[in-house]
Design a protein with these regions (language model features):
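Short pre-active-site segment immediately N-terminal to redox-active cysteine/selenocysteine motifs
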Residues: 21-22, 29-32, 75
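Conserved helix-turn-beta segment immediately C-terminal to the redox Cys motif
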Residues: 21-23, 38-59
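Conserved redox-active cysteine motifs that mediate thiol-disulfide chemistry
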Residues: 28-42
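N-terminal targeting signals for export/organelle localization
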Residues: 1-5, 45
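A short beta-strand-turn-helix
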Residues: 5-24
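Non-catalytic, surface beta->alpha helical segment in thiol-disulfide oxidoreductase systems
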Residues: 75, 81-108
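Structural microenvironment flanking redox-active thiols in thiol-disulfide oxidoreductases
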Residues: 61-68
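Conserved Rossmann-like nucleotide-binding pocket used by diverse enzymes
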Residues: 9, 29, 57
Length: 108
């Protein structure tokens, strides 16, 4: 998990992600997942560049099983970008910064 990301769970997923006026990148991961930590560091380095244009959130699938099930998360890390509360694109695995930027370009 990245230090600057908003922590989201089943209780606040709707308010932080689905009701957000900004596009939201959601990183679905787990504390035991090595690739998730690598992706989190990459995302943490990107957040400041999107300030005011997008939100970055982290969901621990063990802490938010309903959100993980709702969006069909079967492996971690999985990144989904949301616009107006609706998924607009996704990536699987610890992907590169350029791929994450391409994904965000769909919604920002």
């Amino acid at each position: 998990m990245a230090d600057k990301m908003i922590i989201v769970n089943d209780a606040n997923f709707s308010s932080e992600v689905e009701q957000s006026s900004l596009p939201v990148l959601v990183d679905f991961g787990a504390t035991w997942c090595g690739p998730c930590k690598a992706l989190g560091a990459t995302l943490d380095g990107m957040i400041d560049g999107y300030e005011g244009r997008a939100k970055f959130c982290y969901v621990d699938i063990q802490e938010a099983p309903s959100a993980a099930m709702k969006f069909g998360i079967r492996s971690v890390p999985t990144v989904i970008v949301f616009k107006n509360g609706t998924p607009a694109g996704s990536l699987l695995g610890a992907v590169s910064k350029p791929k994450l930027e391409d994904l965000l370009s769909v919604v920002v």
